Amino acid sequence: MGDKGTRVFKKASPNGKLTVYLGKRDFVDHIDLVDPVDGVVLVDPEYLKERRVYVTLTCAFRYGREDLDVLGLTFRKDLFVANVQSFPPAPEDKKPLTRLQERLIKKLGEHAYPFTFEIPPNLPCSVTLQPGPEDTGKACGVDYEVKAFCAENLEEKIHKRNSVRLVIRKVQYAPERPGPQPTAETTRQFLMSDKPLHLEASLDKEIYYHGEPISVNVHVTNNTNKTVKKIKISVRQYADICLFNTAQYKCPVAMEEADDTVAPSSTFCKVYTLTPFLANNREKRGLALDGKLKHEDTNLASSTLLREGANREILGIIVSYKVKVKLVVSRGGLLGDLASSDVAVELPFTLMHPKPKEEPPHREVPESETPVDTNLIELDTNDDDIVFEDFARQRLKGMKDDKDEEDDGTGSPHLNNR
């Protein structure tokens, strides 16, 4: 096979009259700007007739189950909607063609019309809230959808079979420069004890990649007459839901309860290791996950990176993580072990994917090699060297097809029930 061509994703409308072509499905938020959404829509001229070709980009926050949508009231809020008249091109929508658009139009012909969207950087990243076992309908969370259709005007009601709908993702990657090493300490003075108990904890770094173990260094100086009976370490996910008002949900995603004790007038030091995995948290309804594309698994939601001065209220879901270290201290006295008090510190950290390495535009690959990254575009000088791949994933065993998903849904937790 020689060089791998430019990989382009396509999806056609159920009636086969429109097809949308996009260079990728993940669009990176670089904090100050977001990758533009550029593509083309190919339309059957006999179907188009005297109508116009519209493409819309919608960022929506679904916060309740679809089966509860009644009387025109929906548990969904559109955070951002942009419309482009792709044909005939409106003066305000005309933009210079990108390299990808030029090549697609050259290959597909004169009935391929370009569209480009700019995503504001203060919009949220794609996040899905994990559904419960009995939830039905679309999952709650923030998603982005590109929709193309032919109509006399934007207000015209469009049937699903006459339009193309594609879910894309807005993603962030870990910054190249990590923040300072997380450390925290606290001192607790107890009644009837002359000297205090001191707890100090630290992480080995500030940024962790998904699936990477987290090392927690715990140092206890117990100058009291109390006994530390137990040490509890937990990794917690915090999800700030910013909609009509702001609410915060927290959920432990990794825990260790050690029976390590610290006797009076002694010191203790140990490193604990925890690894937060989605596989260990499948039953937790409402847990924030990275936005999911059909037929692909996902992971715990990545930390949200905010630029300075960002309006937190416009953001749908803000995700952060902390490690909590808690000492369970026996109070002693007449009650003995029946009464205890806690001493705790928290260590915020960042959990994200690393930025993918950019590969050179040309790479010799053997015919038997399967491309690992199907989201990769490789530009070359051969305008005919374009590989089209269906936007919908290959059907996996046991997975429902698009029609089944529309009928049955994948489940959605209601925020009020979290």
Curated annotation (Swiss-Prot):
Pfam families: Arrestin_C, Arrestin_N
A GO molecular function held by the record: arrestin family protein binding
SUBUNIT field: Monomer. Homodimer. Homooligomer; the self-association is mediated by InsP6-binding. Heterooligomer with ARRB2; the association is mediated by InsP6-binding. Interacts with ADRB2 (phosphorylated). Interacts with CHRM2 (phosphorylated). Interacts with LHCGR. Interacts with CYTH2 and CASR. Interacts with AP2B1 (dephosphorylated at 'Tyr-737'); phosphorylation of AP2B1 at 'Tyr-737' disrupts the interaction. Interacts (dephosphorylated at Ser-412) with CLTC. Interacts with CCR2 and GRK2. Interacts with CRR5. Interacts with PTAFR (phosphorylated on serine residues). Interacts with CLTC and MAP2K3.
The keyword Acetylation belongs to this UniProt entry's keyword annotation: no
Keywords: Cell membrane, Cell projection, Coated pit, Cytoplasm, Cytoplasmic vesicle, Membrane, Nucleus, Phosphoprotein, Protein transport, Signal transduction inhibitor, Transcription, Transcription regulation, Transport, Ubl conjugation
Chain segments carrying region Interaction with SRC: 1-163
Renumbered residue ranges of the record's region Disordered: 353-374, 397-418
Protein family per UniProt: Belongs to the arrestin family.
Keyword field contains Transcription regulation: yes
Binding site for 1D-myo-inositol hexakisphosphate: K250, M255, K324, K326
Descriptive protein name: Beta-arrestin-1
Basic and acidic residues composition bias: residue spans: 355-366
Effect of P91G: Impairs interaction with SRC; impairs ADRB2- and HTR1A-mediated ERK phosphorylation; no effect on sequestration of ADRB2
Residues where Phosphoserine is found: S412
Domains (record comment): The [DE]-X(1,2)-F-X-X-[FL]-X-X-X-R motif mediates interaction the AP-2 complex subunit AP2B1. Binding to phosphorylated GPCRs induces a conformationanl change that exposes the motif to the surface.
Summary of the function given for this chain in its UniProt record: Functions in regulating agonist-mediated G-protein coupled receptor (GPCR) signaling by mediating both receptor desensitization and resensitization processes. During homologous desensitization, beta-arrestins bind to the GPRK-phosphorylated receptor and sterically preclude its coupling to the cognate G-protein; the binding appears to require additional receptor determinants exposed only in the active receptor conformation.
Tissue specificity remark: Predominantly localized in neuronal tissues and in the spleen.
Annotated GO CC locations: basolateral plasma membrane; chromatin; clathrin-coated pit; cytoplasm; cytoplasmic vesicle; cytosol; dendritic spine; endosome
Modified residues (Phosphotyrosine): Y47
Gene Ontology biological process terms in this record: adenylate cyclase-modulating G protein-coupled receptor signaling pathway; endocytosis; follicle-stimulating hormone signaling pathway; G protein-coupled receptor internalization; G protein-coupled receptor signaling pathway; negative regulation of apoptotic process; negative regulation of ERK1 and ERK2 cascade; negative regulation of interleukin-6 production
Record PTM text: Constitutively phosphorylated at Ser-412 in the cytoplasm. At the plasma membrane, is rapidly dephosphorylated, a process that is required for clathrin binding and beta-2 adrenergic receptor/ADRB2 endocytosis but not for ADRB2 binding and desensitization. Once internalized, is rephosphorylated.
Cell location: Cytoplasm; Nucleus; Cell membrane; Membrane, Clathrin-coated pit
Region (Interaction with TRAF6): 318-418
Interaction with CHRM2: annotated segments: 45-86
